[in-house]
């Protein structure tokens, strides 16, 4: 996946997909009552980016739905997966379940159109804090109680705090998650981070008893770092410049081994060479 980073205004969906992204990441901020409120990052953010673009969350979902509904004038066939970077650190730990419930209601209504020809993209719920794992259970319970448990087929998970791989595995056990796991690793583009933990995540993904299905690395803006990440075997790279990732994927060394994922690829299935 060529993942566009920090896509928080509806107009940016077109912008990033047109540069080559087949996936986007969107920040979600919550109000004091754990309602998803804005798609907003705020200051500070990645070097070279405007930190303050925003929409109301439900309005963003409607724009995203149009971009991922075949036949809509705004439809992008290429856009197959969306990562919601859930900014839950503003919440108390005991609000995580409520945040999940409210998130599910918002998505059901505004993105999935109550199960009636809604947006088709796969969704990854990315949570920054292992203590907030009940967001997942709250989300699942709500889709089930609202009569749409089948939509969970479209939902995956990520814990984005660069925690020990073993601790993440234990947390998924507590949350009752047995698949659909993306593991992120990374740091803001203003700083450098090695690939040690990415390699551990890839090893877990490729082992017979690992919990990880896919690994992505963030935020990569340079060709050299893109090559290093691909050499380490990642499934996705998050970037401020999707055209840079697309260019590297076109280099002869990588063209033979990697391709841009399409909607027919299963994002929850570990790729076997």
From Swiss-Prot:
Cofactor note: Binds 1 Mg(2+) ion per subunit.
One GO cellular component term noted in the UniProt record for this chain: extracellular region
Disulfide bridges in this chain: 45-51, 47-190
Entry comment describing in which tissues the protein is expressed: Expressed by the venom gland.
EC number per UniProt: 4.6.1.-
Entry-linked SUPFAM superfamilies: PLC-like phosphodiesterases
CDD domains assigned: GDPD_like_SMaseD_PLD
Signal peptide limits: none
Swiss-Prot/TrEMBL GO biological process terms: killing of cells of another organism; lipid catabolic process
Active site feature: 5, 41
Keywords: Cytolysis, Dermonecrotic toxin, Disulfide bond, Glycoprotein, Hemolysis, Lipid degradation, Lipid metabolism, Lyase, Magnesium, Metal-binding, Secreted, Toxin
Any matching Pfam family: GDPD_2
Physiological role: Dermonecrotic toxins cleave the phosphodiester linkage between the phosphate and headgroup of certain phospholipids (sphingolipid and lysolipid substrates), forming an alcohol (often choline) and a cyclic phosphate. This toxin acts on sphingomyelin (SM). It may also act on ceramide phosphoethanolamine (CPE), lysophosphatidylcholine (LPC) and lysophosphatidylethanolamine (LPE), but not on lysophosphatidylserine (LPS), and lysophosphatidylglycerol (LPG). It acts by transphosphatidylation, releasing exclusively cyclic phosphate products as second products.
Family assignment from sequence similarity: Belongs to the arthropod phospholipase D family. Class II subfamily.
Name recorded for this polypeptide: Dermonecrotic toxin LdSicTox-alphaIB1bii
Species name: Loxosceles deserta
């Amino acid at each position: 996946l060529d993942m566009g980073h920090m896509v928080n205004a509806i107009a940016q969906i077109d912008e990033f997909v047109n540069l080559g992204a087949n996936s986007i990441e969107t920040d979600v901020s919550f109000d004091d009552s754990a309602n998803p409120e804005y798609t907003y990052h705020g200051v500070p953010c990645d070097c070279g980016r405007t930190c303050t673009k925003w929409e109301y969350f439900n309005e963003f979902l409607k724009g995203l739905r149009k971009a991922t509904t075949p036949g809509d004038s705004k439809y992008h066939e290429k856009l197959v997966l969306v990562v919601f970077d859930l900014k839950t650190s503003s919440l108390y730990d005991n609000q995580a379940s409520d945040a999940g419930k409210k998130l599910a209601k918002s998505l059901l209504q505004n993105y999935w159109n109550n199960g009636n020809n809604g947006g088709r993209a796969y969704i990854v719920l990315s949570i920054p804090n292992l203590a907030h794992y009940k967001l997942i259970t709250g989300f699942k319970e709500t889709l089930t109680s609202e009569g749409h448990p089948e939509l969970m087929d479209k939902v995956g998970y990520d814990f984005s705090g660069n925690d020990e791989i073993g601790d993440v595995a234990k947390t998924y056990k507590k949350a009752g998650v047995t698949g659909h796991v993306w593991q992120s690793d990374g740091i803001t583009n203003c700083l450098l981070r090695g690939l040690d933990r990415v390699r551990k995540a890839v090893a877990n993904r490729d082992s017979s008893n690992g919990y990880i299905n896919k690994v992505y690395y963030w935020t990569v803006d340079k060709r050299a770092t893109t090559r290093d990440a691909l050499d380490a075997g990642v499934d996705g790279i998050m970037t401020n410049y999707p055209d840079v990732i697309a260019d590297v994927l076109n280099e002869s060394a990588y063209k033979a081994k990697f391709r841009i994922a399409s909607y027919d690829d299963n994002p929850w299935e570990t790729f076997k060479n």
